[in-house]
Each structure stands twice: as structure tokens, then as C-alpha cells.
Amino acid sequence: MTRVSEEAMKDLLSVYFIMGSNNTAGDPLTVIEKALKGGATLFQFREKGEGALKAGDQTAFARQVQALCKQFNVPFIINDDVELALELDADGVHIGQDDDKAADVRARIGDKILGVSAHTLEEVLKAEKDGADYIGAGPVYPTETKRDTKAVQGVSLIQEIRRQGIGIPVVGIGGITVENCVPVIEAGADGISVISAISKAADPKQAAEAFSEKVQATKQSAHS
């Protein structure tokens, strides 16, 4: 296995769907399948918070989700659990600033995809140096899903990353909807990451399709 290229990573980040079993009132596997059908390009398994599955149940559910992702040829990333990622041979790991250090995680996961959440330029540069393949920059907008989030910062960090000429792939994170996703891409992000705007949508497939269309159109016009 070799490290994912910067260009490939930028494409994968287009519509990054993040979900756990407790992020929907519907059947989780059905919701995930619909999102993948609708055009989600990357998936992150994030089983956290109230009502989340524990230990064995979590692993069993993760395996089912991983199988779905394989079916749609979408990389399967695990949030903040290196052991589980190694046990399942997941495609990668995403960590926050409070989790294990990025350099340690990189050493453990080899060439798998490594994503790191960052809230300041300093954190971005450190993550890049430590071997991150992409940055999750945010929170861009207010979010209900993560109760412990840092201060909302709009697209300022994304703009600053690009102004400084930092080329690492970046995905916007936090409170992103179909209605407000365009400025995130215009600021220089390679994609948007979404939980509830897809997981709680009346039609997750349609929601994923709408994100996909908006993101691709905005990326094309930004590069033309």
C-alpha cells in the first residue's frame, strides 16, 4: 500500500459523510447505503455520544458498514479508534486535537489515510508535518451534533490555509448544509463533511446527490 496522493485525496473529500448508529432515527445501514448511492465519496464511522453502541456491538456494526463502503468503492475511515481501524483493516483514521498525537497514529497505521481536525493555522502545520493526508477545518457553522465543539469560525481558517500557500487537502466541517456549502468550497476547501444534513434528511440519497452536484459545480467554476 502506498500513501494516497494529494490529488486523489482532494477528490475523495468532495462529499465526506460521517455517521454513527445514533445519528439517525432511521435504520443506520439503510441511511448509509442511500448516502453512498447518492454520491458520498468518503465515509467516516463515528460511533460517539448518547446512545452509541459499545464494544462488541460497535465492532459488528462497523464491519457491516465497512462491507457497504467496499460495495460502493468508498474508503472507510474510523474516527479516533486506531485499534478498531487496525483490527478491521480500515482505509484510515481521523483524529481530533485531543486524541492520540498524529505522528504516533501515522507510525501505527502505516500508509493508511490519516485525517486531523484543526482549528488554527499552527495546528494545520503541525498535522501536515506529522503526516496527515488531510485536514478537517472548522467548525465552519454552528453544529448540533458535536456538543463539545470549539468556537465557530466560518471559512476564515480555510482561507488562511490557502493564502499561506499550504497545499494539504482540506475538508470543511461543522453545520454544513446544501444551502450553505458553496462558500466553503469557494474559500478553498476540497470538500465538505456532513453528518445530520444527510443522516437526518427525509431522503439521504437525494441529500447526498444535492451536495455532490453543488460541490462539483463549485469546484469546477473555481478551477476554470
From Swiss-Prot:
**Gene Ontology, cellular component aspect:** cytoplasm
Q: Which family does it belong to?
A: Belongs to the thiamine-phosphate synthase family.
Q: In which pathway does it act?
A: Cofactor biosynthesis; thiamine diphosphate biosynthesis; thiamine phosphate from 4-amino-2-methyl-5-diphosphomethylpyrimidine and 4-methyl-5-(2-phosphoethyl)-thiazole: step 1/1
Question: Corresponding gene?
Answer: thiE
* Protein name in the entry: Thiamine-phosphate synthase
- The residues that hold Mg(2+) are D80, D99
Q: Does the keyword Cell wall biogenesis/degradation apply?
A: no
GO terms for molecular function, please? magnesium ion binding; thiamine-phosphate diphosphorylase activity
